Every structure is written in C-alpha cells, then in structure tokens.
Amino acid sequence: MKEFCNKRTIFYGGLVALILGIAGYWLFLSSFSSAKEEIMLRVDRDDNCDSIQAKLERVASPRQMLGFRILSGVVGMKKVRPGCYIAGGGISTLALFRNIRGGRQTPVKLTIPNVRTLGDLAARLSLQLELDSAQLASAFSDEALCQELGYDTTTIGCMFIPNTYEVFWNISAKDLMARLHKESNAFWTSKRKAEAKAAGLT
C-alpha cells in the first residue's frame, strides 16, 4: 500500500511538473508575436509599464500579454529604459521582457538624405529618431558644438554624408553629431580629398 502511494505521488508530481513546464513554455518561451517580420517597439522617455503594455497589445495576443504581465508583476520593471526593441520575428516573451527591462535595445537604420537645408534635414531625421526637429535644429545651430567638431553653423551641413547608418533610436543630439562627425572623417580619405580638390569642390 505504501509503495502504491509513493508511486501515485511520483506520478502526480511528474504530471504537475509537466503541466507547469508546458504552461511556462506557452506563456514565456514561445514567440511573443505571430508576425514573422521584425516589429519595432519604441519606448519613449515618458512611458511606463502600463503604456508599454498598451503598445504591445497591438501586436500580441491575450495569451502572450498574460505572460508579459506575469513577468512584470513578479520580476518587476521599476525603471523603464527608453529605446527601440524587437517585438516580433520569433523573439520569446521572456527575451523581450529581459531586453526592455535591461535596456538592451536594437539599433535602427538612420538614413541621411540629400536635402537643401539643415531645416529639411532636421525634419527628415526626426521621423527616424526619438529626437524632434527642434532639438536637431538646435544642435545644428549650436556654435560651440559645431566648433568642437571643426565646423561652424554655416559649414556644418558639409559634415553630413548621405548614407545609411545604424544608431540607437534614442540617441542624443550631441552623440548623433559626434557619430556623424566620425563617419565624415572615415569617408573623407586622402584619396577622396584629392579627387574633390581636383574637381574644384573644395
């Protein structure tokens, strides 16, 4: 009788463990979104846990959101870290939660277009970043910042090389300027400078 009870205890214990394992996988380890393509979640500086969940509800099912809410309640997300995070493409609910909680964001592709004015550039870049056009325009007209990079407010436009770069969505205006300055220096090799001079472009 005792042996029978032990076997029954082991059986039910194993059954409970199996059910919990399946539920855990179903809630936390399966894909957060059924979308095969990458879905970018943009977390603003004024977002909180509730507003993040509201954004995620647009791309996730109730089951996936239940897993995310359980993690938020048990583990917690005291400090919201702004940035751009992948919420599709097969990422699990647990991985997405860890990325958002830890601030492990995904870089975005920033395209520098051919435009006529710095105002146009600020407007176009603001569509791709958290920065708004006013913040970008302010950086472009910041005399001290421009001088620090070797330009002035009338020549700073020469620093922006039309191309596509990877940057963090919530990059600051100053860090963006420093990054584009680095890209400009990398572009203008001695050979390119000589070619530009020969063509009368400098």
Regions found by a protein language model. Name each.
Residues 1-202:
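Conserved catalytic or metal-liganding residues and their short signature motifs at active sites
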